[in-house]
């Protein structure tokens, strides 16, 4: 192998001034000869090739000298290659000036001279002209690949000098972007060229303008036309552009004139002989539709449709293009090819006629100019004629001679500019075509065939190489296509330059080709020879791009068989006179757009044809809003005041987003329902019904915003109710959705609809509904995917009620609907988050999807408003003449008025050419010039060559920001494909917004332009001018905002065989800031879709999904999806090619009609029709429709359990707020976080003084983080000693949470406690969670805090409900609140001390270790309470059902040792003790022993099974209630039946009844009691510790006393249930109707609110977490069971024994788990009824003293019974499903004053909390509940640890539809929620210890392993399980309204970051059990 001459040589190329092509040749020469090259100088280089010495820096020279590198100029390479040897570099010294290298000082402004004088010295003036640039830009001598942007020719006055100035835009990315060149022709016929480069288009234009102005100052003048000498100065690219100049200015020879007349006559004559209508009266839109029909027939022909079906489809083609003799021949490919050629010919003729104002036979010169093609005759005596003739004839392979008659040189402008000559391999080839087609070919060039195999069907090799442009190199082949003309008998051949580029030879046919194979530019079908067999008879060359073709000649020839005729056209070669311009330019005021609201001068009400008012009786509207869509039902009632039957027409106005989907009428007791039928069928049925005397109703949609209802034969004096249902989309303004109902009709729509006569039988009275003012009502439901921020109306006063995501609004009484309509504004949170809705059809297997996408672009993209350009392009072509051009000016002027002074603007008029206001966009400070430029425009600029404007602007692309083109046109563009190519090519910097004007506008091409150009299309319909301003404003707003374009949707389809998704819109338009996209689709079993879009040329992708949970059932989205498909059919883009678009429309027509019928939607093809059969003997208006009843049937109130939010006076309570039948609360924020109550109980209204006092009472507030407590408790409580003051103090508004600290300070106005004290008080008061206290749910029960225990059974919730509790209402000063020392501690022997704190003669509660211990007598009441009233219907309380598990509970004597049990010893510090023994009735209970610091008291066990409510005294606990009558038959309640499992429950007498028990002994310090045995399954009862959750005492000996149970607390033996009214049922009472729900008593309130004390431990549990099914707890009150699942729960608060060992460095974590409340299961039977709940109902864990202290002294049992009765009534109303009972109302007013008693014990509480702060987290209990797989179950045990109301959460999830996930899906989701809650709980605790982590799933493993290594693997396993499972439920958190994501949801559930007015806030804060 021979080595190259440059082997082992590495050349460093430093050729700065060498042209690009020479640089490439240099590189190629080096590589082909074995060398290598580099652009960097390195030690490996052997040679440096430089073209000028100035390119080498000092550093380069040092390196060259150091490494001994040889230097040479480029000639060294060229000569070495030529001589095939490596030459000596010394002969190519680069230091000597190279001939091609310019001087160094001219690197900025280059001057090149050709034929300069001998001294080579340029003239001084020319040098000065060029020294303008200041940019450091390398400028090549000549741009090789460029386009000419601007050019001018100037001649010097008085001298022969000429200069051509060009602004060139480089197409080479490596070259200078813009170059300004000036080519001078000097006086001595020598030339000189100057060039300057610029980097930006703005700089280039400014320099160009400045350069031309400088030439003018030097004496040069601008010239309009190029002379022959000046043309030689132009660049090759400019000479191609000058073809346009030659066409416009050149004279027309006789030969060219004759040719034009021949091809014109041939084309026009063919059309006249074929078509029935003249071509100038045809619409291009009809041509496009006809082409679509042909494509549809072609497809049907391929599919084998029957001939009858084909003929039926072709009939539509003949309707669009009427023929003189419709073809009756068989439909085949040949016929279709002929008709396609006919359509193209019609299109060509219409376009040509546009230039000549549609004149049928313009003069020859006008025809010539209309073709826009240069045609020159080539004389036969020239060398060019001989050369072309020879090339044509030499390839004639047939034996038939051909006679060349004439040759014409042709050239088209866009072919010259777009021709891809750089592909190479340019050959002269032939294309034959019939003479009638030559007119179109010259006008628009050769086009790709629409159907390749339709070309020349007579040939055997039709479409052999697919869909391309076919050429041949043989005349004999082209003759087959070049048919002789009928005018003169000659044939025409098109000779073209074809850039074949890299051509592939094929020997087999390939019909599927639509482009050249990869790597090739063209295809050559090789003809068959004897040696090479192929499929081709002739050589065929095929290209697939029109810009590979450039026409050069038209050859006129004939064959021996042709008969040449003499043709003498009419001599008319002169151009017609130009139209006279208008004498005066119209003023801008003449083009003002009408106002947006044109209804101000229209009368309101109904009117007949004589304008007599016919008042509308009433208008009622019911609506349903879901997300951004709505369904509205309108009831219109009116009466025929005439004495004769009439046909009335009713005009129903709507916006263009609406679609009617239902029409009904009620008249004379009849209900007529409209049916959708095809329009003609409906009208025929209507006419027949009217003629037969029947009633008939017809509803049409003539325009998008007007529906007409024709009511035929309306009887005299008849009242008619018309019910119209429609669907619509809401408009969007930022995050606000706007729903609007118009109150008037567009006047320009009324006349046409009213004047149309449908029947001739009865009188027609035309009615215009202009807005009914007499009677109007509206009610709407609103459902949003995210939180509703606000709801308001600027037209009407509303009342409303709402939850987070749902609301109901209605107008107030007395509202009216005037011409302003009705407007509703809905503020949304997170409106920018995409979402997906799926709806199942209730009656068939169908699913409709809706995607909502509203990108928040303003926050993502920078504001480029000041950098953007706006170019207003006004179409001034001839087709715009008339009213269309007036409308275009109106649009342009209004758009101009909306542009600010800081906006860069330019205005361009275009037709065949273009004119611009400025040479480049400028800021307009004065719009006068711009306005005059628009006003002076006239539709006389010829064709619509918008591509020239696009090309010009694309060459001058903006350096920064966007260019926004606003195109105002009728859309009849020339060169559509080229125009679209230019738009797509420049999308990165240019956006195209299109405005269609005129009734015949080509909306498809304009819509496609905007779609491809990242803009938006608007059609300005002359029938809806009232919306024009809004449309223009919308376009200008989009122009100023960032955009998101090329949006596409990909639907997830599980089956590969699934049909193509039916989506609307098929082509998604571009989106802008605040734009909202709704995409509909009929896609079965689809739960996921992907949205893709481009923002600033970066692709973004987002996925939206839903689950079975989110799928709804109904027809609303189905109707919306059908409506969207119909709209897309009418106005959308089904395909970018117009022919295919029309074909798809024809295919979809039947589908559209079917969708219309199925969904009752009016379309352009269908109408509503209803016929009312009438009998001549029927009595007129015998049954007047009951309007109110019909309206009431449409109930949209889906929040019946929420009351209306209404304003009320400050100091009084109105009657409307007191409703005894339904007592509910909904709160309105006052702006400061305080929730104000709206309504109160009617029972409370019986004591107005209490309510007024409550109203005036200041609301106490609680701050979560800090709380200032006043110390003037003495002053505040001293006043309460009197009954009057006690009454006023104890009844005030409910306690609410206010976050402002100053409000607390102002109300309490006391000295601040120390921070530590405040913190302790906060924890005591808030139970470590600050909760809102809604008034409707605050319990009036005695309070127990999570950190406060009583040393008695009263420490349990049930004990608090005891009727024996005796705590007075008045409270003394706090014992530790003042300056005096605390009282002495109680003695161990039980010595009594005075206790004013508890208001009795018994000793005060002992205080030890921060624990208040009230005396048992004060807690249990001793003998102070009278017996309860007897039970109605019997003397015995029915026994409760058995407890599951089979355990028998012995009597209290056996349980607690009877009266012989000695008192327990005193406990030392840290010891947990059980409650004292409970004795039988009659025993006096002494004060309990003292507890050491830190002692925790357990609560009693939760017991279920009783079916009786407590007595009133147990509900309100006071000792001042009158005694109820005794129970008949004795004082003892009969024993209950055995509890399931055999357990006997002790009687309350044994629990609470004793009075003489001596104080129990104190246990020594450190004493521990062994744990009790489990309950379930045992034959013995559990010890007290197991029931009360305290310390572990040994089980006591059995005894015999029994006791009864109640679902709401213990019922003492001497007390029966309260007497209730006959309408309420006692639980378990068989004498009352079973249908009524169980009664919830006051215990329900306590159990929700208070929970257990700090010492509570949950000893019982479910058998396993798997056995726990929250859904089972809503079955009834008697199905709760307990089992000893986790014994560690019994010692939950013995943290030293529970917590695992930890490293010494890690201190124990502080947690609120130690303050756990009552087990959830204890109250599940009560709380399970809470199906519905008020949005803000959540009760704070507050400290409450006894009920008695909250009630006035004169509060009677009647009041308590009233509350019970109300509660029962409420439960009856709501089916026992609501917590918003009247007892809640009562509790709201009772509980608030309990803060007084809270304040009196702050010091002790603070001391207690200080102790509690050191309590560690019960880690062992928490991780004991974790499953093997790592997750937790959502059980009450877990809820107890997390301080979470599990049942409330489960109830809410059930309401949200969690069961739709299925059993497994539901359980798995509950496990996920539980696990995430635990992880959030751990995350928060670890974060307090200093851990830093991103999220609850991404914790710091290192930190966890250091601090709690024993739990590291458990936490890791949980995180991995949660991460995997979370992905299976995308967006489920939002669907269930839990929050934005799991992070925020879990924080809210745990109270870490509570948020008011959220779903979770209301779910969990109403009941913390």
Swiss-Prot record:
Residues 1541-1556 have a biased composition (Low complexity). It is found in: Cytoplasm; Nucleus. Component of the vault ribonucleoprotein particle, at least composed of MVP, PARP4 and one or more vault RNAs (vRNAs). Interacts with TEP1. Residues 1-94 form the BRCT domain. GO terms for molecular function: enzyme binding; NAD+ poly-ADP-ribosyltransferase activity; NAD+-protein mono-ADP-ribosyltransferase activity; NAD+-protein-aspartate ADP-ribosyltransferase activity; NAD+-protein-glutamate ADP-ribosyltransferase activity; nucleotidyltransferase activity. A motif (Nuclear localization signal) lies at residues 19-25, 1230-1242. Keywords: Cytoplasm, Glycosyltransferase, Methylation, NAD, Nucleotidyltransferase, Nucleus, Phosphoprotein, Ribonucleoprotein, Transferase. It comes from the Eukaryota. GO terms for biological process: inflammatory response; protein modification process. Residues 362-566 form the PARP catalytic domain. Mono-ADP-ribosyltransferase that mediates mono-ADP-ribosylation of target proteins. Residues 1443-1541 form the FH1 domain. Residues 600-728 form the VIT domain. Belongs to the ARTD/PARP family. GO terms for cellular component: cytosol; nucleoplasm; nucleus; ribonucleoprotein complex; spindle; spindle microtubule. Its EC number is 2.4.2.-. Residues 1372-1387, 1402-1417, 1425-1444, 1485-1513, 1521-1540, 1557-1585 have a biased composition (Pro residues). Residues 235-363 form the PARP alpha-helical domain. Disruption phenotype: No visible phenotype. Mice are viable and fertile for up to five generations, with no apparent changes in telomerase activity or telomere length. Residues 1808-1969 are annotated as: Interaction with the major vault protein. This is Protein mono-ADP-ribosyltransferase PARP4. PANTHER family: PROTEIN MONO-ADP-RIBOSYLTRANSFERASE PARP4 (PTHR46530:SF1).
């Amino acid at each position: 192998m021979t080595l190259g001459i440059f082997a082992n040589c590495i050349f460093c190329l430093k050729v700065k001034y060498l042209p690009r092509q020479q640089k490439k040749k240099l590189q190629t020469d080096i590589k082909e000869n074995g060398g290598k090259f580099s652009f960097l100088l390195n030690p490996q280089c052997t040679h440096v090739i430089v073209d000028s010495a100035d390119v080498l820096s000092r550093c380069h020279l040092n390196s060259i000298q150091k490494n001994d590198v040889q230097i040479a100029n480029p000639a060294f390479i060229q000569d070495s290659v030529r001589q095939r040897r490596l030459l000596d570099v010394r002969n190519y010294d680069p230091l000597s000036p190279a001939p091609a290298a310019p001087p160094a000082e001219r690197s900025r402004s280059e001057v090149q001279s050709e034929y300069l004088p001998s001294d080579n010295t340029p003239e001084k003036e020319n040098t000065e002209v060029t020294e303008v640039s200041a940019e450091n830009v390398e400028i090549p001598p000549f741009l090789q690949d460029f386009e000419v942007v601007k050019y001018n020719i100037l001649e010097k006055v008085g001298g022969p000098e000429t200069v051509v100035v060009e602004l060139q835009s480089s197409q080479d990315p490596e070259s200078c972007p813009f170059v300004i060149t000036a080519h001078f022709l000097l006086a001595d016929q020598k030339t000189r060229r100057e060039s300057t480069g610029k980097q930006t288009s703005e700089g280039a234009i400014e320099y160009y303008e400045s350069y031309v102005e400088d030439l003018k100052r030097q004496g040069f003048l601008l010239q309009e036309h190029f002379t022959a000498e000046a043309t030689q100065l132009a660049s090759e690219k400019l000479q191609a552009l000058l073809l346009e100049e030659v066409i416009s200015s050149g004279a027309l020879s006789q030969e060219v004139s004759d040719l034009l007349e021949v091809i014109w006559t041939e084309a026009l004559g063919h059309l006249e002989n074929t078509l029935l209508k003249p071509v100038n009266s045809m619409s291009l839109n009809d041509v496009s539709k006809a082409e679509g029909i042909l494509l549809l027939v072609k497809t049907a022909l391929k599919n084998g449709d029957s001939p009858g079906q084909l003929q039926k489809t072709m009939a539509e083609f003949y309707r669009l293009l009427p023929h003189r003799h419709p073809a009756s021949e068989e439909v085949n490919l040949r016929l279709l090819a002929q008709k396609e050629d006919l359509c193209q010919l019609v299109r060509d003729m219409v376009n040509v006629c546009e230039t000549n104002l549609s004149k049928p036979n313009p003069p020859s010169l006008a025809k010539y100019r209309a073709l826009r093609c240069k045609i020159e005759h080539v004389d036969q005596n020239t060398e060019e004629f001989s050369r072309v003739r020879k090339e044509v004839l030499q390839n004639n392979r047939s034996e038939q001679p051909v006679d060349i008659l004439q040759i014409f040189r042709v050239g088209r402008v866009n072919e010259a500019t777009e021709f891809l000559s750089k592909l190479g391999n340019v050959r002269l080839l032939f294309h034959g075509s019939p003479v009638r087609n030559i007119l179109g070919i010259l006008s628009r060039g050769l086009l790709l065939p629409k159907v390749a195999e339709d070309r020349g069907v007579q040939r055997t090799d039709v479409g052999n190489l697919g869909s391309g442009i076919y050429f041949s190199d043989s005349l004999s082949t082209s003759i087959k296509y070049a048919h002789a003309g009928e005018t003169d008998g000659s044939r025409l051949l098109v000779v073209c330059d074809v850039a074949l580029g890299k051509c592939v030879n094929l020997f087999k046919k390939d019909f599927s080709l639509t482009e050249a194979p990869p790597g090739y530019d063209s295809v050559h079908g090789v003809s068959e020879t004897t040696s090479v067999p192929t499929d081709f008879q002739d050589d065929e060359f095929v290209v697939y791009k029109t810009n590979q073709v450039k026409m050069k000649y038209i050859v006129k020839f004939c064959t021996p068989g042709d008969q040449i005729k003499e043709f003498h056209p009419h001599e008319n070669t002169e151009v017609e006179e130009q139209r006279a311009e208008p004498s005066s330019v119209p003023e801008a005021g003449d083009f003002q757009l009408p106002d947006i609201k044109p209804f101000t001068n229209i009368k309101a009400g109904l009117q007949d044809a004589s304008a007599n008012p016919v008042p509308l009786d009433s208008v009622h509207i019911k609506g349903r809003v879901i997300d951004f869509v709505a369904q509205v039902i309108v009831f219109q009632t009116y009466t025929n005041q005439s004495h004769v039957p009439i046909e009335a027409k009713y005009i129903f106005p709507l916006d263009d987003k609406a679609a009617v989907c239902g029409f009904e009428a009620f008249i004379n007791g009849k209900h007529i329902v409209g049916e959708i039928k095809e329009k003609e069928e409906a009208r025929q049925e209507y006419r027949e019904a009217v003629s037969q005397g029947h009633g008939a109703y017809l509803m049409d949609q003539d325009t998008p915003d007007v529906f007409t209802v024709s009511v035929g034969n309306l009887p005299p004096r008849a009242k008619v109710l018309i019910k119209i249902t429609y669907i619509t989309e809401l408009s969007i303004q930022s995050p606000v959705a706007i729903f609007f109902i118009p109150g008037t009709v567009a006047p320009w729509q009324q006349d046409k609809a009213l004047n149309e006569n449908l029947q001739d039988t009865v009188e027609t009275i035309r009615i215009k509904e202009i807005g009914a003012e007499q009677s109007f009502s509206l009610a709407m439901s609103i459902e949003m995917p995210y939180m509703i921020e606000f709801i308001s109306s600027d037209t009407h006063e509303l009342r409303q009620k709402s939850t987070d995501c749902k609301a109901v609004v209605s107008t107030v009484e007395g509202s009216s609907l005037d011409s302003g309509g009705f407007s509703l504004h809905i503020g949304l949170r997170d409106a920018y988050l995409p979402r997906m809705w799926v709806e199942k059809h209730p009656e068939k297997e169908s699913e409709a999807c809706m995607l909502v996408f509203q990108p928040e672009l303003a926050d993502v993209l920078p504001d480029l408003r000041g950098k953007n350009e706006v170019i207003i392009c006004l179409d001034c072509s001839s087709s715009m003449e008339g009213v269309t051009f007036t409308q275009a000016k109106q649009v342009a002027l209004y758009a101009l008025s909306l542009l600010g002074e800081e906006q860069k603007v330019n205005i361009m008029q275009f037709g065949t050419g273009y004119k611009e206001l400025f040479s480049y966009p400028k800021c307009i400070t004065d719009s006068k010039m711009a306005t005059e430029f628009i006003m002076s425009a006239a539709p006389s600029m010829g064709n619509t060559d918008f591509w020239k404007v696009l090309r010009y602007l694309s060459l001058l692309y903006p350096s920064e920001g966007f260019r926004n083109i606003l195109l105002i046109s009728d859309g009849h563009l020339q060169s559509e494909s080229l125009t679209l190519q230019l738009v797509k090519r420049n999308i990165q910097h240019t956006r195209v917004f299109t405005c269609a004007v005129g009734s015949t506008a080509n909306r498809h091409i304009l819509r496609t332009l905007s779609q491809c150009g990242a803009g938006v299309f608007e059609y300005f319909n002359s029938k809806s001018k009232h919306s024009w301003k809004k449309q223009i404003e919308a376009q200008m707003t989009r122009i100023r905002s960032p955009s998101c374009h090329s949006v596409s949707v990909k639907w997830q389809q599980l089956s590969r065989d699934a049909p193509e998704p039916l989506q609307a819109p098929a082509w998604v338009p571009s989106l802008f800031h605040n734009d909202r996209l709704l995409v509909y689709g009929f896609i079965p079993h689809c739960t996921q879709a992907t949205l893709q879009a481009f923002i600033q040329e970066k692709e973004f992708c987002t996925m939206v999904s839903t689950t079975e949970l989110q799928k709804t059932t109904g027809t609303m989205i189905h109707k919306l999806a059908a409506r969207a498909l119909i709209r897309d059919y009418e106005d959308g883009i089904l395909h970018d090619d117009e022919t295919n678009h029309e074909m798809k429309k024809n295919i979809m027509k039947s589908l559209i009609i079917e969708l219309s019928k199925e969904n009752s939607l009016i379309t352009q093809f269908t109408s509503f029709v209803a016929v009312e059969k009438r009998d001549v003997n029927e009595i007129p208006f015998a049954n007047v429709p009951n309007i109110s009843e019909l309206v009431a049937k449409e109930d949209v109130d889906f929040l019946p359990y929420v009351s209306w939010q209404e304003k009320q006076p400050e100091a009084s309570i109105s009657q409307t707020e007191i409703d005894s039948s339904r007592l509910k609360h909904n709160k309105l924020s006052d702006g400061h976080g305080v929730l104000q109550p709206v309504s109160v109980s009617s029972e409370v209204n019986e004591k107005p003084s209490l309510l007024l006092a409550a109203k005036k009472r200041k609301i106490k507030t609680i701050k979560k983080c800090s709380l200032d407590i006043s110390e003037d408790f003495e002053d505040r409580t001293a006043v309460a000693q009197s009954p009057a003051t006690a009454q006023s103090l104890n009844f005030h508004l409910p306690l609410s949470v206010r976050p402002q600290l100053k409000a607390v300070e102002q109300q309490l106005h006391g000295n601040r406690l120390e921070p530590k004290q405040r913190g302790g008080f906060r924890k005591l008061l808030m139970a470590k969670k600050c909760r809102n206290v809604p008034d409707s749910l605050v319990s009036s029960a005695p309070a127990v805090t999570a950190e406060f225990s009583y040393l008695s059974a009263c420490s349990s919730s049930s004990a608090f409900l005891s009727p024996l509790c005796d705590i007075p209402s008045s409270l003394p000063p706090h014992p530790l609140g003042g300056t005096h020392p605390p009282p002495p501690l109680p003695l161990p022997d039980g010595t009594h001390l005075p206790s004013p704190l508890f208001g009795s003669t018994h000793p005060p509660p002992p205080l030890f270790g921060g624990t208040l211990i009230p005396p048992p007598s004060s807690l249990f009441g001793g003998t102070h309470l009278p017996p309860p009233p007897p039970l109605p219907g019997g003397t015995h309380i029915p026994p409760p059902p058995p407890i599951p598990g089979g355990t028998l509970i012995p009597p209290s004597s056996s349980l607690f040792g009877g009266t012989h049990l000695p008192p327990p010893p005193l406990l030392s510090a840290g010891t947990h003790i059980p409650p004292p023994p409970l004795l039988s009735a009659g025993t006096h209970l002494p004060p309990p022993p003292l507890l050491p610091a830190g002692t925790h008291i357990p609560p009693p066990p939760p017991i279920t099974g009783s079916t009786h409510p407590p007595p009133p005294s147990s509900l309100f606990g006071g000792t001042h209630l009158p005694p109820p009558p005794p129970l008949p038959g004795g004082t003892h309640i009969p024993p209950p039946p055995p509890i399931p499992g055999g357990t006997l429950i002790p009687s309350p007498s044994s629990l609470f009844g004793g009075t003489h028990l001596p104080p129990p002994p104190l246990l020594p310090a450190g004493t521990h009691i062994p744990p009790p045995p489990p309950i379930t399954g045992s034959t013995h009862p559990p010890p007290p510790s197991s029931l009360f959750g305290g310390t572990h005492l040994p089980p006591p000996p059995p005894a015999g006393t029994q006791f009864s149970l109640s679902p709401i607390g213990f019922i003492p033996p001497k007390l029966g249930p309260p007497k209730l009214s006959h309408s309420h049922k006692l639980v378990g009472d068989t004498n009352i109707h079973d249908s009524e729900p169980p009664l919830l008593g006051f215990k329900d309130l306590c159990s929700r609110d208070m929970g257990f004390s700090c010492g509570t431990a949950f000893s019982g549990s479910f058998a396993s977490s798997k056995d726990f099914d929250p859904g089972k707890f809503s079955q009834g009150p008697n199905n709760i069971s307990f089992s000893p699942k986790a014994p560690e729960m019994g010692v939950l608060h013995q943290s030293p024994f529970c917590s695992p060992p930890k490293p010494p460095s890690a201190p124990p974590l502080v947690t609120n788990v130690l303050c756990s409340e009552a087990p959830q299961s204890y109250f599940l039977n009560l709380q399970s009824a809470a199906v519905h709940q008020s949005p803000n109902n959540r009760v704070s864990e507050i400290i409450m003293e006894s009920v008695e202290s909250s009630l006035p002294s004169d509060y009677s049992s009647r009041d308590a019974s009233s509350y019970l009765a109300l509660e029962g009534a409420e439960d009856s109303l709501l089916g026992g499903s609501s917590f918003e009972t009247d007892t809640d109302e009562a509790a709201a007013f009772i509980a608030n004053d309990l803060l007084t008693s809270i304040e009196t014990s702050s010091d002790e509480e603070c001391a207690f909390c200080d102790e509690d702060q050191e309590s560690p987290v019960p880690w062992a209990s928490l991780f004991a509940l974790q499953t093997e797989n790592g997750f937790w179950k959502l059980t009450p045990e877990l809820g107890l640890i997390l301080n979470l109301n599990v049942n409330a959460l489960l109830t809410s999830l059930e309401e949200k539809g969690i069961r739709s996930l299925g059993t497994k899906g539901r359980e798995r989701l509950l496990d996920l929620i539980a696990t995430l809650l635990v992880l959030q709980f751990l995350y928060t605790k670890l974060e307090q210890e200093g851990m830093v982590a991103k999220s609850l799933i991404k914790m710091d493993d290192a930190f966890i392993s250091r601090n709690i290594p024993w739990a590291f693997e458990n936490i890791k396993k949980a995180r991995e399980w949660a991460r995997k499972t979370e992905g299976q439920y995308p967006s489920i958190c939002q669907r269930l309204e839990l929050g934005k994501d799991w992070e925020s949801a879990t924080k809210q559930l745990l109270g870490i970051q509570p948020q008011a007015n959220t779903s979770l806030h209301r779910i969990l804060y109403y009941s913390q059990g």
